[in-house]
Amino acid sequence: EEFAFRRFDRLSGGERQRVVVAKAIAQNPDLFLFDEPTSDLDLRNQIEVMKTIEELVSDPNSRKSAIVSIHDINIAARFADRILLLHEGEIKSEGTPIDVLTEENIAEGFEVSCEIIQSSGDSTLRVLVKDEIKL
């Protein structure tokens, strides 16, 4: 609603991204295909958009599914039921976030070293990238 009367070319990148996601949801398809739906958003809005998508597909009465292309490893770890890890156009690994997001897969796919931190009480994991950026 907050963007309804504003011209699209007057919106910021993040606002445009949220409008595009809202338009896709308004179409009410059975299958959503999102290509980087959080790319221009700050962290709070990334989580808000992904929670909205998660709510759409987790409702047992809706029978909706979503395929989300995303480069943020931690957002994928938090929201994905299944992950396809692609490297140079080929599927390198497929499965749950815990199965796919291993230090070896991330090192090969993203060419960075990392540490996987898994919560002991549940299946939550976090990827801590260790590589430093040289200035």
Task: Give the positions of each predicted feature.
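Conserved ABC ATPase signature
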Residues: 7-11, 15
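Conserved catalytic motifs of ABC-family nucleotide-binding domains
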Residues: 28
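ABC ATPase nucleotide-binding domains
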Residues: 108-135
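Helical segment within the ABC ATPase nucleotide-binding domain
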Residues: 47-62
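Catalytic Walker B motif of ABC-type/P-loop ATPase nucleotide-binding domains
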Residues: 32-35
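ABC ATPase "signature
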Residues: 94-95
